[in-house]
Amino acid sequence: MKDLKVAVVGLGYVGLPLAVEFGKKRTVVGFDINQGRIAELRQGIDSTLEVDAAELKEASELSFTFNLQDLQKCNVFIVTVPTPIDEHKQPDLTPLVKASESIGKVLKKGDIVIYESTVYPGATEEDCVPVLEKFSGLRFNEDFFAGYSPERINPGDKEHRVSSIKKVTSGSTPEIAELVDSLYREIITAGTHKASSIKVAEAAKVIENTQRDLNIALINELAIIFNRMGIDTEAVLKAAGTKWNFMPFRPGLVGGHCIGVDPYYLTHKAQSIGYHPEIILAGRRLNDGMGAYVVSQLVKAMLKRRIHVDGARVLLMGLTFKENCPDLRNTKVVDIVRELAEYNIQVDVFDPWVSAEDAMHEYGITPVGTPSHGAYDGIILAVAHSEFKNMGAENIRKLGKAEHVLYDLKYLLDEDKSDLRL
């Protein structure tokens, strides 16, 4: 164990916190193909805000590089690259394959490659390992080995950090499984769970987020029903929540790099073996349609107040996929922006957490620096940033015209302080 030198490949929201924790204990090389990312990390800056300068400094054994040759001294490679979906909602393994190609070029006999990226069951051994074999010329489970330990990072969550979240581990042989588990036990104070196989660990990860996606879909459907009945959904959920085993989910937009993406990995694999999943895809359709539903509700409310919709101005408060973090990946707030444009509504997006450069690069959106007072026909509270909560209803209302509609998607305000709630 003492001889293990770790390389963490991919230094985003998942890889960097992991590299920092290992860097407090042993030699670690953090690798990323983004040279700008490496430059900022070398300066002690993390633009994702997951790790602060003090934590980076504390990881005294951690170095950063974009040079693949610097990984030759490592014998354990942990892959933490994104696993997105394409425009057809099919798994896009390109980052994973490219990372495997790179590692294959520096892989040596006895080395171990551990994947943390969310995949469908079988991806590690069926998709990644052959790439490692091809580019290294080595044989799997003879010359090199594999492990899988799914990430459970929750971006922006300062309470549930890498070390305090229980970790599932696995390996391609019983001996490697034990070694992988021992390695993670060095940094995971919450403990580990050694799965019986890599496929079991892969499946466990993908159903964690699929289950959450379906639970939110159920609550979203209930919210639509209760809205038609004139019943406040939050009040219903509070009442139902008094029973000990009622699960406290809330309605809303389902975006981000995990919950709105991972179910498609599982359904893809299911379809490839001849099974068409009904419930999982139904939940995805419902959640993917929430942006359009929100806009339809807003437009109806505006029409009831005789607010002219064509050419109206709407302020969208929040663009990130979740509160109090700058992560824009797969944010479903963009669906609201696009749907409003279908009504020829002018949209201003305000989000103090977002880099204007990132918003333009990812979605072609230029956020406003400061919203104009008395300028908007509609205001949508789309993300529960602390800044918005601290503003209070009165200050938020001041941004609207004398006649406007305030739609609170996130229950940031008391029921009587907004005009619409999800």
Curated annotation (Swiss-Prot):
Record carries keyword Cell wall biogenesis/degradation: yes
Q: Which reaction does it catalyse?
A: UDP-N-acetyl-alpha-D-glucosamine + 2 NAD(+) + H2O = UDP-2-acetamido-2-deoxy-alpha-D-glucuronate + 2 NADH + 3 H(+)
By what means is the activity of this protein regulated? Requires either potassium or ammonium-containing salts for activity.
Under the heading SMART domains, the entry gives:
UDPG_MGDP_dh_C (SM00984)
Thermal activity profile? Activity is relatively constant over a wide temperature range from 37 to 56 degrees Celsius. Optimum temperature is between 37 and 42 degrees Celsius.
Q: In which pathway does it act?
A: Bacterial outer membrane biogenesis; LPS O-antigen biosynthesis
For the null mutant, the annotation states:
Deletion of the gene causes deficiency in B-band O antigen biosynthesis. Mutant shows a defect in flagellin glycosylation.
EC class name: oxidoreductase
What positions constitute the catalytic site? Answer: 258
- Report the EC number(s), separated by commas if there are several: 1.1.1.136
Which residues hold NAD(+)? 14, 32, 37, 83, 118, 329
Q: Name one Pfam family in it.
A: UDPG_MGDP_dh
Q: Provide the disulphide bond pattern.
A: none
Q: Which GO terms describe its molecular function?
A: NAD binding; oxidoreductase activity, acting on the CH-CH group of donors, NAD or NADP as acceptor; UDP-glucose 6-dehydrogenase activity
What the protein does comes down to:
Dehydrogenase required for the biosynthesis of the B-band O antigen of serotype O6 lipopolysaccharide. Is also required for flagellin glycosylation. Catalyzes the conversion of UDP-N-acetylglucosamine (UDP-GlcNAc) to UDP-N-acetylglucosaminuronic acid (UDP-GlcNAcA). Can also catalyze the conversion of UDP-N-acetyl-galactosamine (UDP-GalNAc) to UDP-N-acetylgalactosaminuronic acid (UDP-GalNAcA), with low efficiency. Can use NAD(+) or NADP(+), with a preference for NAD(+).
Q: What family does the Swiss-Prot or TrEMBL record give for this protein?
A: Belongs to the UDP-glucose/GDP-mannose dehydrogenase family.
What's the protein called, per UniProt? UDP-N-acetyl-D-glucosamine 6-dehydrogenase
What is the species of this protein? Answer: Pseudomonas aeruginosa
